[in-house]
């Protein structure tokens, strides 16, 4: 991937505001909102579980005396308190070859990458599923509850995976990425973002600023770390 230079970009003026998990209205983006294109534009639908509760994990302790703790803001934590910042991210461009993106996934031991332009404006996300078109073989895989899958079936799937990799030559990330993904802001309430990750079953949420530039990523691992830290702080404050 070529070098990335920073410069000003056109601001995002209209993004769909996620008003609920099922209904959307088009409004100017606000400092604490999510954004999402209509689900018809996304490759795979998500399974929602409205019964999930995360409030208990992210309620700020009444008083904390810990120099290593992240301070609560307005009685709660925000995405910016626990996200992985931009300087620690691995990113690709639409022009990055699929082979290079796959090598980056393997080298960095991640399952997905933000896709940016030369100005760090987020233009999409791409996952290992996208890059290898794994949807084409996942439907024929063994049931997830099968602890010991059939050897012949597993070997057949592995062979199909090898064939998929052989077909990536000449393709670029822009051909396979998911454009205009669901995003959050660094000021978004952490509990809201955690609930969104749980209910959509996404692995990560890009974090953007008011101009749509990538400033971080909130992953499931970040949420687990936050829950553990807040639990310790709550215990220490009692």
Curated annotation (Swiss-Prot):
It comes from the Eukaryota. The keyword Plastid applies. Keywords: CBS domain, Chloroplast, Plastid, Repeat, Transit peptide. One of its GO terms (biological process) is cell redox homeostasis. The keyword Lyase does not apply. Coiled coil: none annotated. This is CBS domain-containing protein CBSX2, chloroplastic.
